[in-house]
Amino acid sequence: MKRRRRDLKQAAESEQEECQSVPQVVSLRDSDQLQIMDEKGDNSLALLPAKLPMRMCSTRERRKYTCEIPPDLLMEIVMRLPAKSMVRFKCISKQWSSLISCRYFCNSLFTSVTRKKQPHIHMCLVDHGGQRVLLSLSSTSPDNTCYVVDQDLSLTGMGGFFLNLVRGLLCFSVREKACIYNPTTRQRLTLPAIKSDIIALKDERKDIRYYIGHDPVNDQYKLVCTIGISSAFFTNLKSEHWVFVLEAGGSWRKVRTLESYHPHAPSTVGQFINGSVVYYMAWLDMDTCAVVSFDITSEELTTIIVTLEAGDVALPAGRMKAGLIQYHGEIAVFDHTHLKEKFLVDLWVLKDAGMKKWSKKRLVLQPCQKHLVHDDIELVVKGTTQDGKVILAPVNMCSQLYILCYDMGSNDLRKVEIKGVPDIWFDKECYFDLKYSLDESEDVIYLET
């Protein structure tokens, strides 16, 4: 009996020694310096010798073994954590919350080369009854031949129309209001409605589009709104533009236009956000297509008419099928109007925005890939991937949801399946939109308005 008690006592002492050698949970305390605390929170940085029992140390003795982690090193350590973990760790202390929430730290996430970045696709589904869902898709294969819905990130009741994004922030419209959503922090903002100066009369069409961009000079996120009102065939065009700075006390402010300004109707598709510049397609009339650029910093609007070459026939707005893409760092109009009938694509590249010069390039689909383009499925441009492939998606959902990726360099068209979409969305007509995340970054900033 005594021997058994002695064995139990030795086992308990051994277990206590092992527990003392285990690294303690790190935290920060409310001080001017970033420090790591011990499990009781009594001292900075519990880097004590493993053989020295913590309970036998006085506060003065433990401080003798304390050392400080430099703030820049601590920031480097935190930056290697997943974004979702950063959000959870904000509750450790006020100092951690201040570090992770500060603008400098958030901006460093977009320039860090040590962070593991994974491209993904955001997809919105909206039915006629107003039911919505926001899905997040990621690739399951190295060659990106299949994207699967992450069920843990699926949000019912989230999402809307005309999805676009910048630096990890999603922008979409719900009932003519702009909504901002941060998938990392799960924060959602609904901005107030705009009191427009132009009113749509009976039988007139009203188009409202929201775009989000980032001002790198003032480090501000801004929302741009274009409102266009027109009669049939884009006659009697009127348009105006508004800006909202995402900061405390922000409000809609009307943009002043120059005398050379062209009223226009924003296109349903055809938008591209290059961080500090927003580009979108528009129509000046039924036969004149243009690209409108809005500089987020200077808040200047520029209208660039897509000029035709000799022998080209202008397509009316109702027939032209095109979208904006990025082509070797330049803005381009990807015109796939004749893709299904003639298996060709016209690419209009903006060579000089200041001089408004365009360059045309024609691409012809390989004969062995013509079966990927069906006559009964209408396609729409959904942007470009990080490696320059154009994303084409069906306008309407089908039982086998997919996208087409077109490599303009090798003239190769590939089909990419999308799996995991709830079956209930295939049994009804719904609005379907998706955006490929070009910057691959996540933002942990908390937005205030």
UniProtKB/Swiss-Prot annotation:
What residue stretches are annotated with the F-box domain? 63-113
What protein name is recorded for this chain? F-box protein At2g40910
Q: Which InterPro entries match?
A: F-box-assoc_dom_typ3, F-box-assoc_interact_dom, F-box-like_dom_sf, F-box_dom
Question: Organism source for this protein?
Answer: Arabidopsis thaliana
Q: Which Gene3D superfamilies match?
A: 1.20.1280.50
Q: Which SUPFAM superfamilies match?
A: F-box domain
Q: Where is this region: Disordered?
A: 1-21
Please give the CDD domains that the UniProt record associates with this protein: F-box_AtFBW1-like
Q: Which NCBIfam families match?
A: F_box_assoc_1
